[in-house]
Amino acid sequence: MPVRLNYDLSCVRLRELGLLAHDNHPPMPERLPQYDDSEPLGFSIFRTLLDDALDLSDLTLPRTFFGRSQIDRVSFRNSDLHESNLCWNDFNGTDFSGADLGSSDMRASLFHNVLFVAANLDGADLRQSSFTECSFEEATMKHAILTRQQGAAMRLSETQRQHIDWRDEDGPEPGGG
């Protein structure tokens, strides 16, 4: 696995890609961000279209806020996005292979043709999201939260199924919807 850039160098990379203003160096939030958090905010993607095979691999961006955005053909391979908020988004052809999404809130999003190969999804809340043509091969999912109805439609290994925190209900709708 390639080495991840630290947070400061990840911000430099985001500036190079035009995703951060040159004078902006957002603080790293101390907890999972919410849609109604007050300033200062960490790095966030809100009501944005990210596409054109954008490469955001090998970055350290924990506690990032993604909201009401469309993420098409973007690579987050081997990126650290743990404790991020990925609610209310459309992810199409996105690659999270080897990424750390542990303890992230990923509810109420659409994931189509998304790779989670060898990703860390431990403790992530995936309820109210749909996963079509997604690969979870070798992904860790200890205590990941899914409904039994979702699980029936997903290709998961027996080990993954044993580690998931299965729920019968969708739970509360995430904020920001």
Could you describe each region identified by the protein language model?
Residues M1-G177:
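Tandem repeat scaffolds
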